């Protein structure tokens, strides 16, 4: 059934998420601070500056790197980070709280912390460092999307779920074919098929057969009939 298929997909996604997270943790712990610093994944050592509430009412703290300031880094707004402290014996203690970059430039960062307890822990550390943490944003979005589809009931989302994942037939509207002299006959038929679809239409074919041209024309024609069209792609190439 559609629900069991989606629940199975949830399970597989959870397994992938746990594996990726564990693999990130393993690589992080075995790489060593020096290599992470050279790759721009880590600042160590760092100093702490003032703490305050930003315009989003988030508790934030200023962080400044003390060494290796010429190395480019990958810290940027919205990325998750975690703090750690290196003991005099060389062992690293990672703090439990996950923080978020609020602002970053070449030598300074402003980091949003989850609470006053985390702030005190960061301020109290002697040999403090900060590094990128496993980014759960995309996984969180995927889990939420699957949950929305599973829970859908009596609405358009539920209809599309059952059409795409079960034997419920899709619907088509009767329209007069539109002529497109600048397209070949196959492309013209595909555009008309899209315009007739009430639920879903799939345009497919080998490379170089003009799928992108067909989709562009279908979007253009749809905008004559609808207010807006959402276009999604795995990359920006198309």
Where are these regions (language model features)?
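Pre-ATPase regulatory/linker segments immediately N-terminal to the P-loop/RecA-like helicase/translocase core
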Residues: 3-6, 60, 66-192
